[in-house]
Amino acid sequence: MTKKIELAQIRVLFLGIWHFLLHLRRRLVEDQINIRAGHLAYVTLLSLVPMVAVTMSMLSAFPVFKGIRGQIEGFVYENFLPAAGDTVQVYINEFVGNASKGTAVGISALVVVAIMLISAIDKSLNNIWRTKEKRSVVVAFSMYWMVLTLGPVLVGASLVASSYVISLKVFEAEALSGMLPIFIARLPMLFSVAAFLLLYMVVPNQKVKFLHALLGAIVAALLFELGKKGFALYVTQFPSYEAIYGALATIPIVFVWVYLSWMIVLLGAEITAAMPEYLDYESSSDDETALNAKPLADASQGDSSSVLTSAEVTALKAVAKSE
């Protein structure tokens, strides 16, 4: 009987996961994340040069980041723009160099375009969370400006801290020497999880539970790493874009990758937002099941002290159906 109940509980667990996936699918269709991802990809391409220009300007303001600018660029392009990172880096650096020579009006326009990207991300995520209360203009602008100015500083600080940790003599010990390559290999994954976690917890204008955001961040980071490797493999092994577009192949490659990246980001957000909805629904269903099951349990046992929990009732029902 105990083994049957354990099997029934496992069956209930997988059934719950299946129901959550169905709920997530309905949410994805309703929110049309493919259209949202296309919009964000378009805005991202428009804002790419302004964002890089503002980021490098912020890093240049701090002498501590002066020697690691090349490392930051290499890390970002290598891990976030697979297969076309080197080419894109050359073009973007050239564009940023031209943009930095512009007038005050031109630089202000670049900042506005960069803020447009942050605003589009904010609106898309709050729509996924069904947020009804909107931030005031002052609060929204302050948050956008903080992200635009402090974001590059935090990225630079994290890379400096990572370089410092890697250079510690403790990693030179024979017992820990094998850990260093593993740590370096997992570093992009850790940065991705941290970035997604921060995005899912801070951007929505409502309280988001840490575990829900962590689940969405881990799923998004795993999909991002798999997508990065898969997309790089496709571009290198099946160079159809280069055969069709020739020298302009970098443009569609970057656009497709940015679109896939936003699909992954929005999918992680949907998972995070769907978790409390599904758990609340399951909790209300369990309460209703327990209320209906108590009289049956009392009548069958003939003892008012014998009350089954909702989980036990669900497991027993599953066993009864299987028999």
UniProtKB/Swiss-Prot annotation:
Subcellular location field: Cell inner membrane
Pfam families on file: Virul_fac_BrkB
Task: Give the UniProt keywords, A-Z.
Answer: Cell inner membrane, Cell membrane, Membrane, Transmembrane, Transmembrane helix
Q: Where are the transmembrane segments?
A: 4-24, 45-65, 102-122, 137-157, 182-202, 213-233, 247-267
InterPro entries reported for this sequence:
UPF0761_bac (IPR023679), Virul_fac_BrkB (IPR017039)
Instruction: Write down the membrane topology.
Output: Multi-pass membrane protein
Q: What's in the GO CC field?
A: plasma membrane
Q: Which NCBIfam families match?
A: PRK01637.1, yihY_not_rbn
Family per similarity comment: Belongs to the UPF0761 family.
What is the protein name given in its UniProt record? UPF0761 membrane protein Sbal223_0320
**Organism annotation:** Shewanella baltica (strain OS223)
Q: What is the lineage of its organism?
A: Bacteria, Pseudomonadati, Pseudomonadota, Gammaproteobacteria, Alteromonadales
